[in-house]
Swiss-Prot record:
Lineage: Eukaryota, Rhodophyta, Bangiophyceae, Cyanidiales, Cyanidiaceae
Cofactor binding comment, as recorded: Binds 1 zinc ion per subunit.
Protein known as: ATP-dependent zinc metalloprotease FtsH
Gene: ftsH
Membrane spanning residue stretches: 3-23, 102-122
Enzyme class: hydrolase
Record note on quaternary structure: Homohexamer.
One GO BP annotation of this record: proteolysis
Length: 603
């Protein structure tokens, strides 16, 4: 800005002087007039005086219409008629010589201003580029001498095993002599692995809050740029700063952005990302070592990381941050419910059992959505109704416009009743939690099931029940409306059924083909894996797999169709109730089923 004033000040002074000079020499005209009109004014005797400045004339005239005024007239080149007429009419004519300095200044002021602005912009751009070039290879890591994340281990719930592992790292940083006395060495790195939303980044913040040592944080994507060598330079700069502040912590979030496996994927070769990874490997455990620097990284794609990055000496510990079970969900809900005003009748245990498959971030979002609904409804406390609606919203999306067409609504009611009734009549399927005709996202209706416990291992009978329940909607449509009226509403169900049946045959060995793993290669070659198109499976075996999958699905469908036809009365009664209320909870649904005179179940 200072240079701009230096360049602009002489030009402003020059322009002001020229303007003053012109203002002193030339009177100010109040209007303009054509040359022909000037001759008319002279014939009428209204012109008193003419001042000529080069090719411009200022006329002192007085007419009955406008009175006395100065009028500007542009004189044609080589015109002398006005001069002859002025002599004849004895009009005063005064010719003024315009200063050459004024002409020169007026011609050069604008070009000089433009040149000055261009020079200033170029100098500013050059300065900026020089600074940017010098800092381009510098690390973008955020540095805190004493981390102030506001999060401690007490604020992290539901992942106690991971907290215990990381508490040892914090204890080592606070009191290394205790460990060194027995010959224990400080771990080089800790890799936090787990699905999205399970609290990996939150754990890193808690470590920073507990350790009271210098803390660097950076995302893996911030290392890689389009320019060659920048990523490796940033890695060197990061570890240089870290070593200067040792002992310290370095947190790399989403390390898979820079740590993907090197190999024979498409494109392969020595690209910029591989150079960055090579530098990271060297800094973590190379010739010089990184004494006093502990690297904590987080990823949800440990399967794509390079093997050299995962070996002991770089990441000594891999801590699995898994999805929370019921007990962990209760602990997480208690942490997030501290700042929420819950109704006394709201049971966090009931919420935890209702939210199987929810990660910690999902549970936090759930309570926040419930709080927003409570405010929207004018309540001062969060009731079970708000939590129930929030769960539905998180799982299935916002409520859509209610279906007004009675025929379509009845068809959807039979479809959802088919799912729920099949699940109720099968002995080894989770009970119905809710059946609704309220549209959400792409679904016109929904059926939820209650997960009583976390099922990590599934039996063949349980998988068969899942297939039959998924086919229940289509079977109900056919049982009531006939095969010709079966709709596209079961497309997603059929996709799930086909995938599950194929896994039972090719992955779980639950078919007449025997206990064999016949999966095709699913390696993602773009992740640096080897290109493998198919395993060593013959075309005959592939045909047998297709036949097994088809036979399994057809057998299940026949059983479910028989079940729907045998329980048509029960189904009609449930549909009528569902059409009236639009939503039935699990208790209401089971009560309607229990009132039936005869139930036919399938073994």
């Amino acid at each position: 800005m200072k240079n701009l004033w230096i360049w602009s000040l002489p030009l402003i002074v020059l322009a002001f002087i020229g303007w003053q000079e012109l203002a002193n020499q030339m009177p100010v005209a109040t209007s303009r007039m054509t040359y022909g009109r000037l001759l008319e004014y002279m014939q009428m005797g209204w012109v008193k005086r003419i001042d000529v400045y080069d090719r411009t004339a200022l006329i002192e005239a007085s007419s009955p219409e406008t009175g006395w005024q100065w009028i500007r007239v542009d004189l044609p080149a080589n015109s002398s008629d006005w001069l002859e007429q002025a002599k004849t009419l004895h009009i005063d004519v005064d010719v003024h010589a315009v200063s050459n300095w004024i002409n020169v200044a007026s011609n050069w002021i604008i070009p000089l201003i433009i040149i000055g602005v261009v020079i200033w912009l170029l100098s500013r751009s050059a300065s900026s580029n020089t600074t940017g070039a010098l800092n381009f290879g510098k690390s973008k890591a955020r540095f805190q001498m004493v981390a102030k994340t506001g999060i401690m281990f007490d604020d992290v719930a539901g992942i106690e095993e991971a907290k215990e592992e990381l508490a040892e790292v914090v204890a080592f940083l606070k009191n290394p002599s205790k460990f060194l006395a027995v010959g224990a060495s400080i771990p080089k790195g800790v890799l936090l692995v787990g699905p999205p939303g399970t609290g990996k980044t939150l754990l890193a913040k808690a470590i920073a809050g507990e350790a009271s040592v210098p803390f660097f944080s950076i995302s893996g994507s911030e290392f890689v740029e389009m320019f060659v060598g920048v990523g490796a330079s940033r890695v060197r700069d990061l570890f240089k700063k870290a070593k200067q502040n040792a002992p310290c912590l370095v947190f790399i979030d989403e390390i898979d952005a820079v740590g993907r496996q090197r190999g024979a994927g498409i494109g392969g070769g020595n690209d910029e990302r591989e150079q960055t990874l090579n530098q990271l490997l060297t800094e973590m455990d190379g010739f010089e070592g990184n004494t006093g620097v502990i690297v904590i990284a987080a990823t949800n794609r440990v399967d794509v990381l390079d093997a050299a990055l995962l070996r002991p000496g770089r990441f000594d510990r891999q801590i699995m941050v898994s999805m929370p079970d019921v007990k962990s969900r209760i602990a997480i809900l208690k942490v997030h419910a501290n700042q929420k005003k819950l109704h006394p009748q709201v049971s966090l245990e009931a919420v935890a059992r209702r939210t199987a498959g929810f990660a910690g971030a999902d549970l936090a979002n759930l309570l926040n959505e419930a709080a927003i609904l409570a405010v929207r409804r004018g309540l001062k406390q969060i009731t079970w109704k708000e939590i129930d609606d929030a769960i539905d919203r998180v799982i299935a999306g916002m409520e859509g416009t209610p279906i007004m067409d009675g025929k379509i609504k009845r068809l959807i009611a039979y479809h959802e009743t088919g799912h729920a009734l099949t699940a109720t009549l099968l002995p080894n399927h989770p009970p119905v939690q809710k059946v609704t005709l309220i549209p959400r996202r792409q679904a016109k209706g929904l059926t939820w099931f209650m997960q009583d416990n976390e099922r990590d291992l599934l039996s063949k009978s349980q998988l068969m029940s899942m297939i039959m329940v998924a086919l229940g909607g289509r079977a109900a449509e056919e049982a009531v409306f006939g095969n010709a009226e079966v709709t596209t509403g079961a497309s997603n169900d059929l996709q799930q059924v086909t995938n599950l049946a194929r896994q039972m045959v090719t992955r779980f060995g639950m078919s007449s083909l025997g206990p064999l793993c016949l999966e095709t290669g699913n390696e993602e070659i773009f992740l640096g894996r080897d290109m493998r198109l198919m395993p060593e499976v013959s075309e005959e075996v592939i045909a047998q797999i297709d036949a097994q999958v088809r036979g399994m699905i057809e057998a299940c469908y026949e059983k479910v169709l028989e079940l729907m036809q045998a329980n048509r009365v029960v189904m009609d009664r449930i549909v009528e109730e569902l059409m009236e209320k639009e939503t039935l909870d699990g208790k209401e649904f089971r009560q309607l089923v229990s009132q039936a005179a005869r139930l036919t179940a399938v073994n």
